[in-house]
Amino acid sequence: MRIPKMIFTLLAALVFIITASGCGAEKEQTTQEKILKIGVTQFVAHPALDLDQKGFLDQMKEEGFIDGQNVKFDIQNSQGDPNLAKTIADKFVGDKVDAILAITTPSSQAAAQATKGTDIPVVFIAVSDAVGAGLIKSLDQPTGTNITGVYSADPVEQQMDLVMEMVPDLKQVGLIYNAGEANSVSNINRAKQYLESKGFKVVEAPVASSNEVQAAAQSLVGRVQAVFVPQDNTVISALEALLKVLQDNKIPLFTGDTESVKRGAVATIGNDEYDCGRQGATMLARVLKGEKSGEVKPEEIRKRTLMINKAAAANIGLQIPEAVLSRADEVVD
């Protein structure tokens, strides 16, 4: 039996519509599958680390990874709790994220542990001693593992030189830090060794939580002429309490990060945290675009800043040498 031409045409059109619809659905499904999941884990909220995160997100956008379009960021904060950092990292692995950006040493260590035996790439930032923290074996070559990142070895010796230059009656320096943070311990050991080699005495005041920072500061009153705090997440998260004790007793505070200087510390030679985040994003983008994380060599942070807070110094009667002011990259009035 011959099918009338009109019926044949209708049947052909129907087949085309069904086929086209199927292809459209398949194309839509493929597009959805291209949305990458990136876990972002930050150990604690404070301005310096928030700048790391902001720099990362801004640079990821410049690299072509737009949140909600081709990538979805799952941003988590462990609120200074190592156990929560581990839980967050484990959840990222369970969610089968495509990559993890870890901000700070504790978060990076948790991510490294959680991703063992997987191929999930981890990029770390805001880590002072990546080798000492057990994240990588060498700074000079690609890791050959799923982990790489930006290490920001603090210029501790230069920071101590700055303390010596700015505090004329310096004899003893107080060091406040969390002994549970590997990066802090590394920097404190360097500071202690350098200060003692120059003939100065060191008074340590370790803490286990941010609640102990004020008491640690109080314990140094009358015993030191200056206090130094490295890039320590625990101590910096309680900066206001620390500053109150030191300012009331006319003791200058020197820190390892620039954001703390903006908040009331006297001075630092610190890392540019925003640029650190951007640098980490560029590394992660390379991995997402096809490079293996184990073939991406760890990088040292690119930018450092000498920052002085004139108002903070004036409040405690500390006169800043003209030689220091003249070479400052940024002065807070």
Language model features: what each stretch is:
Residues 18-22:
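C-terminal motif of bacterial Sec signal peptides marking the signal peptidase cleavage site
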